[in-house]
């Protein structure tokens, strides 16, 4: 995030109405995110129109300027991280005999469905994980393998690395 409200105020003619936004690539299929800086110079009607347009692309979220770098990193870089996760899941399934096209479809739908479930219910992601992890079952074995390899810290570190760039 290079230009925010104050930057545009200095660059644009006085009285120009503007809103800083950061869309991500899934807006191409109306399943994306448009991060909007909470501070703007739009009228209430203009902001309502902008929200309507951006919500048609997926989800529109207003954030304070200080949160723009982290929010933009999460939503803007996240699709690359999700794609790596989909590819890794598919590679694991292919290694065990699932055809690649099928593995990609399964991994992508699983990720999309899980995300939609969390958005629809508001359930804490940890509770969603716990609901799938039966005692002594296969899922908890897989979760333990991810934890041993530092999955969570690797994901968190990727956000830190980008925000501090």
Predicted regions and their residues:
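ADP-ribose/adenylate-binding Rossmann-like module
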Residues: 1-4
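Internal alpha-helical scaffold of NAD(P)-dependent oxidoreductase catalytic cores
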Residues: 7, 11-17, 33-70, 82-120
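Short pre-catalytic strand/loop immediately N-terminal to key active-site residues, enriched for Gly-Thr
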Residues: 18, 68-73, 125-130
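Active-site capping/gating segments
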Residues: 20-35
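A short acidic, helix-capping loop that chelates divalent metal ions and anchors anionic groups
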Residues: 28-32, 70-72, 141
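A generic short alpha-helical patch detector that favors 3-5-residue windows
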Residues: 77-81, 105-106, 131-134
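NAD(P)-dependent Rossmann-like dehydrogenase/reductase catalytic/cofactor-binding core
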Residues: 108-165
